[in-house]
Amino acid sequence: MSDFPAAGSGNKRLNAIVYGRVQGVGFRFFVLQQAVALGLTGWVRNLVDGMVEVLAEGDTANLQELLAVLHEGPDAAFVRDVKFHYSVATGEFREFDIRYH
């Protein structure tokens, strides 16, 4: 079984944890811009251990595109790894925003 949902399989939820130098480098704002441009809803936040968590819902293809840019990040970031999984979208979000715990 693949970690990627089949294209055209409707809305899904992506939960990702981004590891590396991802705090203090504009990573959350970068994710916000990308997610809004892709029409996704959800949030991004810093974790106390230095990682960044992303929870996004939307079209499968757009989530996969967001996942690809999470591996890159903004210029000042250094992404070491991205752990992620997909699940069923709940539709609970109306927009994408930055959360502060």
Tell me the role of every PLM-derived stretch:
Residues 1-101:
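Intrinsically disordered, low-complexity, mixed-charge
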